[in-house]
Amino acid sequence: MGRKRSISMYGCFLAFGLSWSVVLMTSLPGNTADLQTIRDRGFLSVAVHDDRFPLSFRDATGHWSGFEVEMAQTLALDLFGKRDAVKFIPVANSDRLRVVADGQVDLAIASITATPSRSRWVAFSSPYYFERSAIVVQNNLPQNRPSQNSLVRTIGDLRGQSVAVLKNSSAMDALMSQSLGLILVEVESYAEGWSKLRSGQVQALAGDRVMLLGAMRKDADLRLLRYEFGLYPMAIAMPKGAQYASFREKVQGVVDRWQRSGWLKEQWQRWNLDS
């Protein structure tokens, strides 16, 4: 299954790579530091999530880890010659674009789906991963229906039920566009979504497939429904503006090299993203 997913993902890169580079690297005014200013400063400021295993997270000791963290550290190595020349800024889902557009960070590597509408606010690199959304339920949680006490097994079993979904997420947009009869409950974070699911406030949680699989590796009571939707190109968000063109070109050049060398594929395998 991993091999099939890797082949499919590389097909997505071939189809999307050029178009995203051309369409989403367009420029408008911004406030973030340019390449020379960043180099003079001596470190890269990167917005990331701190609770998205295996993409970006902090362990009990506060150590940063994950696929997107590895990307930021490898980018810092290319710019400054050392992996630790990066300052991680935890960011909420709803603030990912704003902190880049407002110049609070140099870029964001935070599970951001590159879309034409979002490109009005930031510029994007070509995709580094293609994600799908999925829905997870608790293994032994019955439907909340008086006349029925069977397990939730299909998406149809959730009709009329509450499903937690991250605010301003691609999963939210996709579910709202479908007529599934779900009661969508917005949450600010996955942590809030897990809390609502485990307490029975919602019957399911929708989100990035890789995030849900990561949680399932830690909790055997969670089960993924056989229903996936959407296909989202995840990309690095960078500032718009002609003055930042050299910075964007540098970042894009590194991403291109990751793709050509097979480094991205190695990282997918390392973090079990190709399963």
Regions found by a protein language model. Name each.
Residues 50, 130-142, 209, 213-256, ...:
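Periplasmic-binding protein-like
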Residues 170-185, 224-226, 255-275:
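Ligand-binding clefts/hinges and TM-proximal coupling segments of bilobed small-molecule sensing domains
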Residues 95, 111-121, 174-177, 191-231:
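A ligand-binding cleft/hinge motif common to bilobed small-molecule-binding domains
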Residues 73, 77, 81, 85-157, ...:
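Acidic, polar ligand-binding/catalytic clefts
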Residues 60-80:
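Short, polar/charged alpha-helical segment
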Residues 42-67:
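Short glycine-rich His-centered loop
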Residues 47-53, 89-94, 103-115, 138, ...:
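Beta->alpha turn/N-cap motifs
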